[in-house]
Swiss-Prot record:
Residues 40-65 are periplasmic. Residues 1-18 are cytoplasmic. Keywords: Cell inner membrane, Cell membrane, Membrane, Signal-anchor, Stress response, Transmembrane, Transmembrane helix. Pfam families: SafA. Connects the signal transduction between the two-component systems EvgS/EvgA and PhoQ/PhoP, by directly interacting with PhoQ and thus activating the PhoQ/PhoP system, in response to acid stress conditions. It comes from the Bacteria. The lineage of its organism: Bacteria, Pseudomonadati, Pseudomonadota, Gammaproteobacteria, Enterobacterales. InterPro entries: SafA. This is Two-component-system connector protein SafA. Its main location: membrane. It is found in: Cell inner membrane.
Length: 65
């Protein structure tokens, strides 16, 4: 009986940690996207094209490694 109670509490704690980790990741991604779109909003169209090109080259080079 006691072992089952302890096991359930450990499982609940693990679930809580997992849920909190997901929430933190979602918040960080949201803040990152807000920062990116804010930066894009402050740049002109030509700057966005240059950044998109550089980002594409960076992603392609990262995948080739």
């Amino acid at each position: 009986m006691y072992a089952t109670t302890v096991k359930n509490k450990i499982t609940q704690r693990d679930n809580y940690k997992e849920i909190m980790s997901v929430i933190v990741v979602v918040l960080l991604l949201t803040l990152t996207l807000i920062a990116i779109f804010s930066a894009i909003d402050q740049l002109g169209i030509s700057e966005m094209g240059r950044i998109a090109r550089d980002l594409t080259h960076f992603i392609i080079n990262s995948l080739q490694d």
